[in-house]
Amino acid sequence: YEKKKNIEKSDEYYIKANTQIKNVLRYQPLSNQKLINNIKKNFSKENLLDYVEHNDENLIFIVGMPRSGTTLVESIVASANNIISGGELRSIYELFKSRYDEDDSDSKDSKDPGSIYLNRINFIRQDHKYFIDKLPGNFHNIGFIKKIFPKSKIIYLKRDPWDNAISLFKQFYVANIPYSASFFNIGVMYANHEEIMRFWKNEMKFDFLTIEYEKLVQNTV
């Protein structure tokens, strides 16, 4: 219906489909706020955990809300010489979760998660100088990334909230991005993501490049 420009009918079916998904998944929007509170607690200036730091200057992490333009930027950056992308890797997320999840009995065992990460990506990176890790949700993990790879590059994609929400709502993500089936849940997640990005920038003073999606797609030269 959308391809036929029957917007009213297409909207009707988008809403019906997402209502069914929402009822099945029963996503709890406050669950991410708990995660953010835990991140802030662990990454306050008074409570930085002591990990081995790696001086690899050639790791590039592309983060942002899903559907914010991360894939577009990944393709642009990866087109340069001597760069390879690993795509949406879950390694940083898994290493972070094992150390900061309050319910994880193995939490904080390793003082060198950076070596674990580098060993995991070596089979993809091989002889390439630069390596891209493009998991949008790593915006949660910027503090963890900058702690173990202080010289890494982080690119943050930011898109208009409403356009971002519509794009998410129209995708069939199901369990991968469970909040995408509800505009309310998307709104809560968007606000959460803005909160943690302000924390990284204003409180922790981490340096990252912010790219606005709208300006990027307008610049076609």
Enumerate the predicted regions with their spans.
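Alpha-helical solenoid repeat scaffolds of the TPR/TPR-like class and their adjacent stem/linker regions
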Residues: 1-125
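PAPS-dependent sulfotransferase catalytic domain
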Residues: 83-86, 90-103, 125-221
